[in-house]
Amino acid sequence: MRTSLTASLVAAAFAFAPLAVSAQGAPKGPPPLPEGAGKPLVEGMCAGCHALQLIQASSGYTRDQWRELTGYMVDMSKSPAQQNEVLDYLAKNFPPNNARPAKQVPGNFQITFKDWVMPQLGQRTRDPIQAADGSIWYAGQYGNLIGRLDPKTGQAREYPLPPDSMPHTVQLDPKGRPWFSGNKNGTIGWIDPASGKPTVYKMPDAEATDPHTVTFDKRGIVYFTFQNANRIGRLNPDTGEIKIVKAAEQRTQPYDIKFDRDGMLWVTCNARPCLLKVHPDTLQVTEIKLPTPGTTVRRLDIAPDGMVWYVNSGAGKLGRVNPKSGEIKEWDSPSGPKSHPYAIAVLDGAIWYNESGVRPDMLVRFDPKNETFQSWPIKSGNIYAGILRNARVTREGTLLIHQTATNRVMEVTPGPARGGEAISLTR
């Protein structure tokens, strides 16, 4: 399915609401786009899917680069005059800039990126995960779909979800079924890959409208977070029983959720300096306070030795909790306090994460043995655009990542340097 310029403008007509007004009558939100020919088209085309401040906060691009980037979002080929007007406006008002510079750390480790562009334009591909047969499932949040990629052929099949699901993630249960979180319509569900038929569970709590991240125990019981609803949930798919508890009385924004080796759940706090430890049977919550002021945590991963590694997104750090001793240690991320680390995965004794708050989005490798960093820019075609929001490890020891703005699923193969460039890109 391709999204045309006309369809984007029609969608924007319904989505483009007036700015909120404060008591003093001044509009809230980011400054308006610069005046000029093309502004109405850009507002109409872009605002139907994402906030206009994403354009203003971008690293800027040349005209050819804007052509490539917008080409992942909407098909303007049948409206060449309007396309030229849009590209001229974007290139003039948002040329390349260095407002959020990344700091690349050199080293002697080589990685190779391989990428695939998913079919539906503007879907914001995210959260790829490997299935038992080697295929890769992913969520297309803005496309209201989940998809299945055959990495051998590059072909993908995409499955439409019930209206307004807006899947925030896809996760596989012990039976290999792909589950999605209905982040906009308060549902959890799974798809039958053969028929495409969804099985959907509606949340019984009227305030639990945004299921977020999903995980499973060995029995297939589903556990999940609600970021804005400030809750944690559990679903028994066999009985349909759902239990939901508040994560805390304070605004916490539970985000990521994973099991440790002892069968306890760990949950990240995206609104304040904490992690949550949750008993899977009772859903009793124990809070672990983190030391750095301004800490917010997007994601975590559990190492084979039981250590809990997390990204301190709010303060630009990488952190580690020793569950046995309670010791907490943090390291400054290379690109600084505004680098906003996001996704994280433990792979082959190293910690891999990204710095989403800088441009380009940086993939970072941390060696805990000698406490050293190395980093690489994540490239999307001929541009640097998009954000990595989740990372998963494959059975072959590679890393599955993505870039939302360019609808890409990516595989990172790590290995020792053998000379040549620090990064090689293959397609």
Where are the model-predicted features located?
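Blade-level signature of beta-propeller repeat domains, shared across WD40, Kelch, NHL, RCC1
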Residues: 385-427
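Conserved beta-strand positions in repeat-built beta-propeller and related beta-rich domains
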Residues: 136-142, 178-184, 222-228, 265-271, ...
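Short loop/turn segments that connect beta-strands within beta-propeller blades
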Residues: 150-154, 192-196, 236-240, 279-283, ...
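A short helix->beta-strand "capping" segment at the edge of beta-propeller domains
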Residues: 103-122
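Electrostatic cytochrome c docking/interface patches
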Residues: 21-41, 117
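The canonical Cys-X-X-Cys-His
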Residues: 42-53, 86, 90, 146
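Beta-rich, blade/repeat-based domains predominating
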Residues: 121-133, 163-175, 206-219, 250-262, ...
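C-terminal capping alpha-helices of c-type cytochrome domains
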Residues: 75-103, 399
